Regions:
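Hydrophobic cores of alpha-helical transmembrane segments in multi-pass integral membrane proteins
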Residues: 2-29, 37-69, 74-126, 144-165, ...
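Peri-membrane helix termini and adjoining interfacial loops of integral membrane proteins
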Residues: 122-133, 171-175, 205
Length: 293
């Protein structure tokens, strides 16, 4: 089975191909006209190969979880979280590549994807927590938080592209053939969608996390760093989407993009803070009372 390094290299090669497309547009590395269609095809094949090996790795993790535990424990470690987030981001990239083949979206999405895969190599792969109960809610909680953070990351890429595109249009600088990006309307609507759905996902992750603790421990530690930050993130994302919607109604597109960028920064800081502390573990008091569990 492939390891994370395999698809890390595959995605890095795809990023190099995206850079080659950009350099061709600038005229610094001109390509023959006959080679350009082939470059686009190779780019798509490379992304598909990366996603395929990525998917095989995820399946291997699932089978390993099923063979070593009485229940499925996918998205139960920080390694799983980073790998699944990167996989979802890779799926989004390929979908965008098929829908917007002329746009150089990969220059903004692929670096974030590589950071997530690199992060997965640096964080522990051991499951968070000690108990095997409430596994369904653990899975729902992990999946919801993963989807939420992935969408915030994708929204960040859309926000950066919007700001670049708006700056060029404002300065009336030529952009066709240099750095081809989607329209401002597309980037704004996509960014708003990412912010809205990420808020819903984080909120569902918060609720499922509370239920998981109630089922597993019979209580909820409301001062737990994970719960506090999840609640704070949900409140921020709801507030950010409301502010963004107000900006949309007033025609302030750049401010809507900045809300996506700011949301990504806040979520990234919160995730790093949660990573630095125990999360999802069975309380020590409960372990003392039930040494056999």
């Amino acid at each position: 089975m492939p390891n994370a390094t395999c698809f890390l290299v595959a995605y890095a090669i795809v990023l190099v191909l995206e850079l080659l497309r950009w350099l061709d547009g600038t005229g610094r590395v001109p390509l023959p006209s006959a080679a350009k269609p082939w470059l686009a095809r190779i780019l798509l094949v490379g992304a598909a190969v990366g996603l395929f090996t990525h998917s095989l790795y995820l399946l291997d993790r699932i089978f390993l979880s099923a063979s070593t535990s009485s229940s499925l424990r996918l998205v139960s470690s920080w390694h799983d979280w980073a790998i699944v987030s990167a996989w979802a981001l890779a799926c989004s990239y390929i979908w965008l590549l098929l829908k917007r083949r002329e746009s150089l979206i990969g220059l903004f999405v692929l670096p974030l994807l590589l950071v997530l895969v690199g992060l997965s190599l640096a964080v522990p792969s051991e499951p968070l927590g000690n108990g095997s109960s409430a596994t369904l809610w653990r899975l729902v909680h992990g999946a919801s938080m993963t989807i939420g953070t992935m969408l915030v990351t994708l929204g960040f890429a859309m926000g950066i592209m919007y700001l670049i595109q708006a700056y060029r249009l404002k300065r009336k600088r030529p952009h066709q053939g240099v750095l081809r990006l989607p329209s401002l309307e597309y980037l704004q609507s996509f960014g708003s969608f990412c912010l809205l759905v990420s808020a819903a996902s984080i909120g569902f992750g918060l609720v499922s996390g509370v239920i998981m603790n109630l089922v597993r421990d019979g209580q909820v530690n409301w001062t737990d760093r994970g719960i506090l930050f999840s609640g704070g993130l949900f409140a921020w994302l709801v507030f950010a989407f409301w502010i963004q919607w107000q900006f949309v109604k007033r025609g302030k597109g750049a401010q809507t993009a900045w809300m996506n960028v700011l949301s990504f920064v806040i979520v990234a800081v919160a995730v790093l803070l949660v990573m630095s502390a125990p999360h999802g573990e069975v309380p020590a008091k409960r372990l003392d009372e039930n040494p056999q569990s």
